[in-house]
Amino acid sequence: MAGVAACLGETSTAFARQPEPTPGKALNLMTFNLRYASSTGANRWPLRRPLVAQVLREQSPDIVGTQEGLYPQLKDIATDSPGLGWIGLGRDGGSRGEFMAVFYRKERLEPVEFDHFWLSDTPEVMGSTTWGNTNRRMVTWVTFEDRATGRRFQFWNTHFDHQVEEARRKAAALVSARIARVPQGVPVVLAGDFNALSGKSRSYEWLTGEGGLKDTWHAAARRSEEDADSFNDFRDLGRNGQRIDWILFRGSARVASAGVVTTRVNGQWPSDHCPVTARLEWE
C-alpha cells in the first residue's frame, strides 16, 4: 500500500543485485518517538516543534524512524527540515491516525520501494488488531539506495504495543519472519519504540535471538549518555540505562557510535522520548 511519500514508487518484492559498498560512508540513524501533537498543555506541539527541529539540525540524521506523528505534525517537520523527505501512512489508513513515518536525507538516499503492514494475524488488513491490543500497530519499511555507495538496504520502522506483552511478543515474531524473507544480501535496519526494555524483554530476546538481529547499542565502539533512559515522560531524565527505543540491524556493519540525545531547553523536552542514534557503516 502506498502511503504519503516525497517520492511515490511501485511497491514490489523484487530486489536488484547488490553492488559492493564503498568504504568510509557511514549512515547516521535515529529512532524518535515524537509524541503525538496536542494543542493544549505544557507540552503542546507548538512549544516542542522548534526543539524537534533543533535536534534534527544538530544530529543531522540520514534516516529517522518516527513514531506517533500525526499528519499535520509530520508536515511541520518536513517544512522545518527541507533537506528531509518522508514516507508514511496513517495506521488508520490514508492520513488518519499515527504514522510510522520514515524521514530520509534526500541528497544522500533514494527510496526505491516501500510498503506497510499491521501487527496482527492479518497484517495486510489495514488497521487490524487481533492480539488483545486496543491501539493499532504497524510497520513501515523502505528500500533505499545510497547515492554515496550505490548500496541498497532496507529500513524498517515500528511501534510495539505499550500494554499487552503477548502482543509485543507476537509482533516480534511477525517482524522477524518478515525480515527473514528479505534476501540475505540485503542489509536491514529495524528501529522503533518497542515499549520494552532492551535485554530484559521477550520481544528483545526474540528479535536478537531467533530473529538474528544485532543491537547497534552493544555493537558500538563508543556510546554517549550511556546511562540515560530513552523514555523521559516529560520529567527529569532517569539515569538507569533503560532503553525502550532501539536500533537493530542485520548484515555486516561497523557501528562507530550510539547514543541517547538528551536535548532539553529551559525545562522543555522535544518529546516524552529521547531520540536514540547510531552511526553505522555497511562492510
Question: How would you name each of these model-derived features?
Answer:
Residues 21-24, 57-58, 79-81, 93-96, ...:
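Extracellular/periplasmic catalytic domains that process cell-envelope and extracellular macromolecules
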Residues 34-37, 69-73, 91-95, 108-109, ...:
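Solvent-exposed loop/turn segments at secondary-structure junctions
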